[in-house]
Amino acid sequence: MQFGINAPFRGPLATPEAIKKIAQSAEKLGYGYIIVSDHIVVPRKIDSPYPYSESGAFTWLDSGGSGSMEQFTLLTWLAALTSRIRLLSSVAVIPHRNPLVLAKSIATMDV
């Protein structure tokens, strides 16, 4: 069994310095993979209760709901920073991207 981590792609840890340290530390510690999530856009206002917080508030909105790094660009950068750890996309919102350009980007990712 392998264990992995989620790369911070938004919030206070989503800085180049922090992501580099986290990714390289995970590789040194023997983790098997790093996952990167995908969020193209988050609405400014959500009226329905969010089921994953006690208050029902969607916590991303506390910081303006933006600032998410682009998934495949971050995965490419992680590939450049590491050598052995596997890289995974958690969920990819494919309809928001040109499928041919995305396929080419993914194929080029680990050169």
Question: Where in this protein do the model-derived segments appear?
Answer:
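N-terminal beta1-alpha1-beta2 module of alpha/beta enzyme domains
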Residues: 1-81
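Glycine-rich anion/phosphate-binding loops
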Residues: 15-21, 95-111
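Conserved catalytic cysteine-centered active-site region
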Residues: 82-90
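Residues at structural and domain junctions
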Residues: 61-64, 88, 95
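Solvent-exposed polar/charged
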Residues: 80-83, 111
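Acidic, glycine-rich active-site loops and adjacent beta-strand->loop/helix elements
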Residues: 9-10, 91-99
